[in-house]
């Protein structure tokens, strides 16, 4: 690692849900961008081998720093590939994005880590510990399945946040994610803490009504009730739902297609403001926990 700068007290946040398609990669993009714009040096690590975060960060093609030999049959990870973090002696050089964030990306081949002896997860933890001294925040976009890669992301993290949609499979993914977090906390990382859940793509019927009294559609309201039940069963209350991000279909589709955050593409849009508020809430919660 050739980054030379004063030591920082880096905080690692893993973004995870045991269900794909919950806007995990885009929200990782939004939160990390907002952290950087707020003056916090931020590193993004894509640990979902579907590479959604990586592909939207580099919509014009995969950089050679992530995949050195893309046209050959053999896998040749570059120095900015997440794969390298699972080894104790590899060169790691994050890509510096135009907005100031640093980025370590992935490709499908990261899945190969799941067939290695599971002690590689501790090499990963050591490499992330070394990176923490260079950053204020490290945002890890985790994968939605219990595996070496998923466990590694959690044993290296300080905090977990869980995005979800208001529908059955997504809230069930929240329940599984919290169960896995508690298992990993008990066996590997007792310092791991749950910051909260945030609802993505919320379709609001009436902003003037209370959460369970008509703000959302009847189906979404029932799913929210069940999400609250899941939290209660895990020992948490409704305050752990940190944000309800409104769904603006055209803005969302166009921003994602262009590889932009909402703040870059439509800074006055409701989702841009809500992700900014969520980011500030995360900072406040972490600072409060550190003071405590």
Listing of model-derived features with the role each one plays in the protein:
Residues 1-292:
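P-loop NTP-binding core
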């Amino acid at each position: 690692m050739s980054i030379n700068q004063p030591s920082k007290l880096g905080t690692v946040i893993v973004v995870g849900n045991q269900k794909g398609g919950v806007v995990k990669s885009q929200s990782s993009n939004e939160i990390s961008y907002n952290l950087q714009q707020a003056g916090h040096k931020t590193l993004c690590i894509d640990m979902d081998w579907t590479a959604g975060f990586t592909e939207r960060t580099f919509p014009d093609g995969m950089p050679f720093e992530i995949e050195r030999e893309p046209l050959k049959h053999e896998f040749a990870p570059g120095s900015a590939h997440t794969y390298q973090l699972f080894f104790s002696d590899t060169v790691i050089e994050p890509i510096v994005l135009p907005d100031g964030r640093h980025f370590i990306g992935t490709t499908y081949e990261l899945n190969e880590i799941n067939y290695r002896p599971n002690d590689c997860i501790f090499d990963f933890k050591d490499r992330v510990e070394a990176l923490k001294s260079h950053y204020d925040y490290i945002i890890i976009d985790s994968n939605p399945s219990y595996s070496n890669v998923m466990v590694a992301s959690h044993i290296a993290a300080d905090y977990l946040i869980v995005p979800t949609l208001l529908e059955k499979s997504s809230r069930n993914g929240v329940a599984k994610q919290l169960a896995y977090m508690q298992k990993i906390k008990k066996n590997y990382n007792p310092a791991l803490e749950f910051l909260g859940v945030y609802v993505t793509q919320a379709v609001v019927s009436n902003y003037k009504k209370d959460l369970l009294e008509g703000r959302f559609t009847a189906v979404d309201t029932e799913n929210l009730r069940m999400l609250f039940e899941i939290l209660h069963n895990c020992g948490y209350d409704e305050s752990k739902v940190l944000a309800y991000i409104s769904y603006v279909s055209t803005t969302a589709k166009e921003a994602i297609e262009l590889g932009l955050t909402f703040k870059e593409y439509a800074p006055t849009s409701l989702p841009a403001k809500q992700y900014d508020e969520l980011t500030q809430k995360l900072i406040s919660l972490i600072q409060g926990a550190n003071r405590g």
